[in-house]
Amino acid sequence: GIFTLIKGAAKLIGKTVAKEAGKTGLELMACKITNQC
């Protein structure tokens, strides 16, 4: 029902946020290593 829908949406949003955060984190680490910040 509606609860499953909300749970599915939350999981999808969580995945997207985690992916974006991971990408940003990697870019931050890379620029720190190369002193390009």
UniProtKB/Swiss-Prot annotation:
Main location (coarse class): secreted
The protein's name in its UniProt record: Esculentin-2JDb
Cystines in this chain: C31-C37
Tissue: Expressed by the skin glands.
Role played: Has antibacterial activity against E.coli and S.aureus strains.
Family as reported in the entry's similarity comment: Belongs to the frog skin active peptide (FSAP) family. Esculentin subfamily.
Annotated GO biological process: defense response to bacterium
Pfam families: Antimicrobial_2
Lineage, highest ranks first: Eukaryota, Metazoa, Chordata, Craniata, Vertebrata
Subcellular location, record wording: Secreted
GO cellular component, one term: extracellular region
Alphabetic keyword roster: Amphibian defense peptide, Antibiotic, Antimicrobial, Disulfide bond, Secreted
